[in-house]
């Protein structure tokens, strides 16, 4: 549920390595 300061509209989340995932075009973690 915490925003990772990254969007995933055109490219995947780079922050997935930190546990972030794409949700509603924005990368979130928990």
Swiss-Prot record:
Keywords: Disulfide bond, Knottin, Plant defense. Detected in seeds (at protein level). There is a cross-link at residues 1-30 (Cyclopeptide (Gly-Asn)). It comes from the Eukaryota. Pfam families: Cyclotide. The keyword Cytoplasm does not apply. The presence of a 'disulfide through disulfide knot' structurally defines this protein as a knottin. Probably participates in a plant defense mechanism. Belongs to the cyclotide family. Bracelet subfamily. This is Cyclotide hyen-F. It comes from Pigea enneasperma. The lineage of its organism: Eukaryota, Viridiplantae, Streptophyta, Embryophyta, Tracheophyta.
């Amino acid at each position: 549920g915490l925003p990772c300061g990254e969007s995933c509209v055109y490219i995947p989340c780079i922050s997935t390595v930190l546990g972030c995932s794409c949700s509603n075009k924005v990368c979130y973690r928990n």
